[in-house]
């Protein structure tokens, strides 16, 4: 029997195969580190008298806690400042490359890895962060790990793991204008639920996926965890190779040729069997937004807020009632009539140059509504520099948006960019949990196109609503 893409990468990295109920011992090719989940791991090494086994396969960047304004000033919050300072000391002591605030390559860890060419097909990638699945867009087996596992990888460059199940997400057809990969993944999560992918590696396949850019693919894989999955993957192809060629850490010359020949073998075999399969028709998809407090509570933008009274399942009805109460929404309200206070464009989901270009195209010649605040936060300093070279920052500021430095920003309430209680946002990030963007904040997950149109109209909107 043939093997799936995930199985091929897994098999290639087994250091020791587990017997019986024992896990396999897997080699890790790339370990990404940031300031939040690493302090205890480094302290564990220190207490045990251990060194980092492969500092050359480890990269650190400051992203979660960093401010996106006044980056030349000391960090005001004492906890955030301590975590950033601790990362700097740990990286210096253990010989790990670090991209600190203000560095030309600093940014969100899942934006930095791919843009440097560190994320490559057929590799294993881990990070103490849920959205490590982003890197699966390259055909890498990439997943988030906990702090104790971070320490294990630092010490041994391996992880003991049991094989994951595999699920095919087949997306056939052609996306309509105005529909993006963010809409696709929100539709996938709405279809299978936030627990539908639990224990699985999701492989996104089909003609619609093949037509996507690498940045669009990263958006989809990024949110695999929101369906409960361990990872998301896409088989590498010419689009992948074109993105990687010439990047700082990509192979060169004959090594590039050899790498591409190997990468071309990283496709699911025709006779391979998935443990589960799901199919979506890309032709039928429209812009998607979330209305509730988990990424699975999403609907097409043209829909209305659901009515709990119409839901037969008691637990689902209760969850809907609870979400609507927190979100301050009334059943039956058209989503297009939901007004927002803030629009956030950024994050490891949608903070890349392609995302900024898409939003800028919508905002060009238009103004952000007077009652709306819009934050535009590039995913990395490299993205910021490129955007400024293209004049995108001028489009944003002319429209009335704020142009910031790189960081996780308003994706999570760990830095100064937060919502206030009751404040409502349209956000291109990945999670809409209660308090995710700040205590009492209300989050609607959207694509960059919907974010830009919403900023102009002041209510959840798509670009077609501006015509």
Swiss-Prot record:
Pfam families in alphabetical order: Aconitase
Protein name: 3-isopropylmalate dehydratase large subunit
Reaction it catalyzes: (2R,3S)-3-isopropylmalate = (2S)-2-isopropylmalate
Taxonomic lineage of the native organism: Bacteria, Bacillati, Actinomycetota, Actinomycetes, Pseudonocardiales
Organism from which the protein derives: Saccharopolyspora erythraea (strain ATCC 11635 / DSM 40517 / JCM 4748 / NBRC 13426 / NCIMB 8594 / NRRL 2338)
Record keyword Kinase present: no
EC number: 4.2.1.33
Cofactor: [4Fe-4S] cluster
Listed NCBIfam families: leuC, PRK05478.1, PRK12466.1
GO biological process: L-leucine biosynthetic process
């Amino acid at each position: 029997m043939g093997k799936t893409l995930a199985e091929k990468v897994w098999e290639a990295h087994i250091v020791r195969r587990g017997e019986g109920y024992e896990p396999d011992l897997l080699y890790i090719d790339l370990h990404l580190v940031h300031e939040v989940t690493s302090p205890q791991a480094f302290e564990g090494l220190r207490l045990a008298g251990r060194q980092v086994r492969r500092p050359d396969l480890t990269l650190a960047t400051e992203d979660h806690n960093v401010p996106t304004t006044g980056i030349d000033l000391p960090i005001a919050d004492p906890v955030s400042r301590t975590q950033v300072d601790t990362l700097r000391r740990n990286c210096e002591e253990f010989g790990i490359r670090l991209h600190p605030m203000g560095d030309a390559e600093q940014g969100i860890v899942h934006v930095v890895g791919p843009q440097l060419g560190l994320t490559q097909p057929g590799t294993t990638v881990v990070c103490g962060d849920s959205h490590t699945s982003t890197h699966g867009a390259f055909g890498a087996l990439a997943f988030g790990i906990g702090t104790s596992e971070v320490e294990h990888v630092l010490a041994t460059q391996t992880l003991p793991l049991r094989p994951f199940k595999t699920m095919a997400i087949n997306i056939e057809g052609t996306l309509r204008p105005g529909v993006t990969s963010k809409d696709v993944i929100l539709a996938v999560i709405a279809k299978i639920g936030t627990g539908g992918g639990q224990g699985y590696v999701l492989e996104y396949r089909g003609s619609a996926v093949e037509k996507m850019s690498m940045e669009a693919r990263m958006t989809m894989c990024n949110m695999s965890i929101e369906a409960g999955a361990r990872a998301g993957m896409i088989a590498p192809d010419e689009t992948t190779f074109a993105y990687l060629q010439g990047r700082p850490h990509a192979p060169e010359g004959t090594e590039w040729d050899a790498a591409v020949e190997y990468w071309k073998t990283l496709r699911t075999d025709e006779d391979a069997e998935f443990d589960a399969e799901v199919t979506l028709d890309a032709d039928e998809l429209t812009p998607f937004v979330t209305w509730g407090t988990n990424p699975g509570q999403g609907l097409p933008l043209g829909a209305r807020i659901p009515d709990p009274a119409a839901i037969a399942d008691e637990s689902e009805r209760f969850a809907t009632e609870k979400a609507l109460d927190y979100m301050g929404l009334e059943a039956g309200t058209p989503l297009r009539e939901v007004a927002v206070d803030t629009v956030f464009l950024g994050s490891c989901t949608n903070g890349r140059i392609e995302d900024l270009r898409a939003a800028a195209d919508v905002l060009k010649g238009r103004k952000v509504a007077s009652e709306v605040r819009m934050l535009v936060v590039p995913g990395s300093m490299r993205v910021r520099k490129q955007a400024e070279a293209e004049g995108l920052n001028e489009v944003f500021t002319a429209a009335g948006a704020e142009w910031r430095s790189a960081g996780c920003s308003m994706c999570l309430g760990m830095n100064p960019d937060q919502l206030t209680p009751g404040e409502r946002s349209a956000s291109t990030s990945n999670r809409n949990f209660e308090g995710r963007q700040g205590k009492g904040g209300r989050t609607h997950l959207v694509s960059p196109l919907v974010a830009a149109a919403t900023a102009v109209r002041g209510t959840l909107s798509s670009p077609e609503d501006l015509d």
